Amino acid sequence: MGLCLRWRRLGFPLPEFRRCELHTVREASAPTPPHWLAERFGLFEELWTAHVKKLASMTQKKARAIKISLPEGQKVDAVAWNTTPYQLAHQISVTLADTAVAAEVNGELYDLDRPLETDCHLRFLTFDSPEGKAVFWHSSAHVLGAAAEQQLGAVLCRGPSTESGFYHDFFLGKERTVRSAELPILERICQELIAAAQPFRRLEASRDQLRQLFKDNHFKLHLIEEKVTGPTATVYGCGMSVDLCRGPHLRHTGQIGALKLLTNSSALWRSLGAPETLQRVSGISFPKVELLRNWEARREAAELRDHRRIGKEQELFFFHELSPGSCFFLPRGTRVYNALVAFIRAEYARRGFSEVKTPTLFSTKLWEQSGHWEHYRADMFSLKPPGTDGVDNSQSGHPARCPKDTLALKPMNCPAHCLMFAHRPRSWRELPVRLADFGALHRAEASGSLGGLTRLWRFQQDDAHIFCAPHQLEAEIQGCLDFLRCVYSVLGFSFHLALSTRPPGFLGEPRLWDQAEQVLQQALEKFGEPWDLNPGDGAFYGPKIDVHLHDALGRPHQCGTIQLDFQLPLRFDLQYKGPAGTPECPVLIHRAVLGSVERLLGVLAESCGGKWPLWLSPLQVVVIPVRTEQEEYARQVQQCLQAAGLVSDLDADSGLTLSRRVRRAQLAHYNFQFVVGQREQSQRTVNVRTRDNRQLGERDLAESVQRLLELQNARVPNAEEVF
């Protein structure tokens, strides 16, 4: 009984409510936990005992009748500091009580076992909701952290939920890493914690108490000093583990029906000192085993569509250790990349955007002015100019040729576009100014998070910024939304929108935020697509519309965005002369449809499984001669296709039969095969087949080329069916 053994080794009696038979693990997999684990747990128990007494006193002193408003207008009675959301859920339905993972009280996430304090609006969250999944996977990350502490003596750093599961970063020492063989052991300990149904216990602690609890964890001490601005912060205890966390969490670990650890990698912790290498273990969990099995089946199907696999098989791109975090696009991959960019460029021209080019390297003074240096410095690549290492360049000529400032590669285009807007006087007559930029961006993602095209150090975006007058804002937002719908429709993606409103600590006047949020809401309502409200999830500089597209496998991806920005125009003192001749400040809209072109290309590759639509395809047509006598005509056909701007290859491998070459073309996912024999040569025709083995018969060569061009230019998704 591995978990029981660990408790007894620390000298603590096994709590009566947790005495249970657990899965047996070998003695070798149950090393003695570090001394600080017992010390921290002992202090937590002391604080918890005091907390329970305080709560009992509050229940007696402040108990009063309160009204709880439920969805659909229903109201129920409760007692302040006594009634919990879980108790109310149980009154409504046993099924609801069993499936709820957390509550939402007045728009804020709330533990199910935390007593309600006053009249409020209450909503229950299940695993089916995005918020419910986030809570569920966050709690699962805590279980993983507890296992890592007990098994590996890990010093925990962070354990968040993600869009597709969870991970935990922890420190094992400078030389120690997590081996793949240790994942099954960690997973088994997680299963023990789950089987024990350990409760998640929420406790508020003072800053001094927090420092005592985490005196052996320099990561948590750093977070306490940096993030804890009030007199107290919350910690959660789960079994032997205690962690600094805002919560909320599940009621107990037994609500996790199935958990699987997936990968181990490295990550970086950046503070004021030198970066430290952390170990990252990721996983997935579900309320029921059946959901895990379904996920595994979908994952297996997704692995067959992995864009890295498709990129290798179709010779689209590759990566090299000599340029980490950057992609090498081969000719075929460049064809897809350029087709995507050309699509967006065509829409830019149609919608009144002006494409610009801006520098890649800037003085950090720019980023200080924009505020990015303060908030984003850890994710930027910076360098010293040549000749500044101890060398006096004061007499070396023009300052522009010998800058002394630290330089940084741009991680986004918005400050450069602000400089471009401000470089000459502007009039209200030229608004809106819509600037688009495909310039290369660099962001210093942790090396452990790099993976294929989804996370890169170097990438490009279909980045654009709109400078407009306040009265133009709604029309511009509607234009951005229409842009999204147009592009995603052509690419075959469905999408969902969410309006994120002002967060705590927002900058600017509340009145401006109210007006902007109202404008965004009106634009969304007129747009006619479903959307959700995410209160408090906006950026500190303005509200935003988050866009989640769904691929052919139903997986969500956040690529596009529409964000309002009140702060950057003020920071750069942007002005235009209004109708009355007085200077006025423009509103700035950040917008992207594809987001990272590289990432979107990867999403597309997986969504279509390598069967690219004709207009994007790097494998449009392969010409196959029946015999060597038709090889010369086959080359003429290929040249005719290439002259028209179509991608074509020739398969004249005489060592393979015709049927083998046709099959090879199908497996390679060529959209069309033009087979030419003696009859086709004499008639100047081609015998057309599709990649799905539909035989369209003999067609005139010139007409076939013209038809392909029509289908390509129209960007139809099913050219093989409508040829």
UniProtKB/Swiss-Prot annotation:
It catalyses: tRNA(Thr) + L-threonine + ATP = L-threonyl-tRNA(Thr) + AMP + diphosphate + H(+). It comes from the Eukaryota. Keywords: Aminoacyl-tRNA synthetase, ATP-binding, Ligase, Mitochondrion, Nucleotide-binding, Phosphoprotein, Protein biosynthesis, Transit peptide. It is found in: Mitochondrion matrix. The modification Phosphoserine is found at S57. One of its GO terms (cellular component) is mitochondrion. SUPFAM superfamilies: Class II aaRS ABD-related (SSF52954), Class II aaRS and biotin synthetases (SSF55681), TGS-like (SSF81271), ThrRS/AlaRS common domain (SSF55186). Its EC number is 6.1.1.3. Residues 64-126 form the TGS domain. GO terms for molecular function: aminoacyl-tRNA deacylase activity; ATP binding; protein homodimerization activity; threonine-tRNA ligase activity. It holds the Pfam family HGTP_anticodon. InterPro entries: aa-tRNA-synt_IIb (IPR002314), aa-tRNA-synth_II (IPR006195), aa-tRNA-synth_II/BPL/LPL (IPR045864), Anticodon-bd (IPR004154), Anticodon-bd_dom_sf (IPR036621), Beta-grasp_dom_sf (IPR012675), TGS (IPR004095), TGS-like (IPR012676). It is an enzyme of class 6 (ligase). SMART domains: tRNA_SAD. GO terms for biological process: threonyl-tRNA aminoacylation. Belongs to the class-II aminoacyl-tRNA synthetase family. Catalyzes the attachment of threonine to tRNA(Thr) in a two-step reaction: threonine is first activated by ATP to form Thr-AMP and then transferred to the acceptor end of tRNA(Thr). Also edits incorrectly charged tRNA(Thr) via its editing domain. Homodimer. This is Threonine--tRNA ligase, mitochondrial. It comes from Mus musculus (Mouse). The gene is Tars2.
